[in-house]
Amino acid sequence: NWTSNQIEKANTAKDVAYLTTVEKECVMYINLCRLYPKDFLKYEVVNYYGTEKYGNYVKYSTYRQSLINLLNFMQPVDALYFDTEAYKNAKCFAIEPGKAGTTGHTRINCKDGNYAECCSYGMDTGKDIVLQLLIDHDVPSLGHRINCLNKAYTKIGVSVQNHVKWDTCAVLDMIW
């Protein structure tokens, strides 16, 4: 299990008063993976096959297996720290498709920015959001995984909002 020291190092957004518990969990779980890839594999990925809501949708996924292979050899990278501007961008874009019922990265009223963006739909916990992005099931580019684990990124903004079709929309914007 995670030590209190590991949780403390990973939980870089814990003192941001306006973030929800789920948003703080997103930052913490990405950081646990970045800081402690082999432990993350052991504690979070090896026995993760999906969610209660969607069943064991990744149990036999080659994408899950490729994440296992990566984490076995990945060197730790620095934690991400909360950034207000990235949060504002993420929040705007979590609300916009949530109301419209859309998915993807096309903005209508939210401004484009110079950041790496990950969008997750339908997940209820920070852990499930992060594992959806890291496993990147059926995303051949593995773009979400690459963004989340890229050592060039140092800052993150996360917003989780309601989505009319998928219940939730989480947007994570990372910058350097």
Regions found by a protein language model. Name each.
Residues N1-S4:
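Acidic, low-complexity proline/glycine-rich segments
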Residues K9-A10:
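Low-complexity, glycine/proline/serine-enriched flexible coil segments
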Residues K14-D112, R145, K151:
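Short, well-ordered surface patches within globular domains
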Residues K88, C92-W176:
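A well-ordered secondary-structure block
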